[in-house]
């Protein structure tokens, strides 16, 4: 997130400072906002399914990486390290997959992973990949979405045509490989009876990201600036505490 240069010098952008405020509250006050939502939940649950899909599409087995990487400035764990760094993002539904693009945040994330992996001794390319994967949504999440929609529609009778069509559409928006879904959840009672699977190769979107020497200089500089900001923030907070 530390990637914006303002006129008149290199300064931390507003977004970075907002994030640093959260980091400070977590470290100093041991308070932080708990982030857990349906998007993160699905991403965590289907992480290995995304790697499996990517493996099948590219004809290479990609194992989940569990190695925690860090250097003096960064830390993190990419999803896969094989010849190059790969990180998968599992979209929540069809619409979000169609709109998915390489964001600035994800680009810097991949660059950071490449830098740390090379520093840890991995013989990899300086080009990594961000891979969006469209994976079946877990059944309990589909059930939750159906229940929420049922309330939003005024609790219609389940045999009403408008309800049946809406529930069927919702299932199609979250299930892309019906054979695998039935294999994973054989007891799930589906509304929809007409299925058109999306081919596996059309359920992966890959963006390449290359690490340049200037990127390393930028991350190093911004990391030092962030540490200095946190130190000054601590001094301010201690002065405020001791002011009375």
Where do the language-model regions lie?
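Charged, glycine-rich intrinsically disordered N-terminal tails and low-complexity linkers that flank
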Residues: 1-45, 49, 53, 57, ...
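Domain-wide signal for the mature, well-folded portions of proteins, strongly enriched
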Residues: 25-26, 94, 108
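A short acidic/basic microdomain associated with nuclease active sites
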Residues: 39, 51-73, 78-79
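Metal-dependent nuclease catalytic cores in nucleic-acid-processing enzymes
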Residues: 48-58, 101-135
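Conserved catalytic cores of phosphodiester-cleaving nucleases, focusing on short active-site segments
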Residues: 54, 78-97, 113
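Short, flexible loop/turn elements at secondary-structure junctions
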Residues: 58, 66-69, 82-84, 89-92, ...
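Short catalytic/ligand-binding loop motif for oxyanion handling, primarily in non-cytosolic enzymes
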Residues: 94-96, 137-141
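Extended amphipathic secondary-structure runs
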Residues: 193-244
């Amino acid at each position: 997130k530390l990637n914006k240069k303002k006129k008149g010098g290199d300064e931390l952008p507003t977004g970075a400072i907002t994030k640093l405020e959260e980091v400070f509250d977590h470290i100093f006050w041991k308070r932080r906002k708990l982030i857990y939502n349906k998007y993160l939940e699905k991403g965590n649950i289907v992480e290995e399914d995304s790697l499996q899909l990517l493996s099948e599409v590219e004809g290479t087995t990609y194992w989940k990486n569990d190695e925690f990487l860090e250097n003096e400035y960064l830390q993190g764990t990419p999803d896969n390290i094989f010849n190059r760094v790969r990180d998968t993002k599992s979209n929540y539904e069809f619409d979000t997959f169609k709109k998915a693009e390489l964001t600035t945040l994800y680009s810097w994330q991949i660059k950071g992973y490449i830098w740390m992996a090379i520093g840890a001794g991995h013989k990899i390319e300086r080009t990594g990949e961000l891979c969006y994967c469209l994976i079946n949504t877990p059944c309990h999440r589909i059930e939750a979405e159906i229940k929420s929609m049922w309330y939003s529609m005024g609790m219609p009778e389940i045999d009403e045509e408008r309800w049946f069509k809406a529930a069927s559409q919702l299932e199609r928006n979250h299930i892309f490989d019906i054979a695998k879904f039935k294999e994973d959840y054989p007891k799930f009672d589906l509304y929809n009876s007409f299925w058109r699977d999306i081919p596996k190769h059309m359920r992966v979107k890959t963006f390449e990201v290359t690490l340049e020497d200037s990127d390393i200089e930028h991350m190093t500089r911004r990391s030092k600036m962030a540490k200095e900001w946190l130190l000054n923030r601590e001094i301010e907070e201690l002065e405020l505490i001791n002011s009375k």
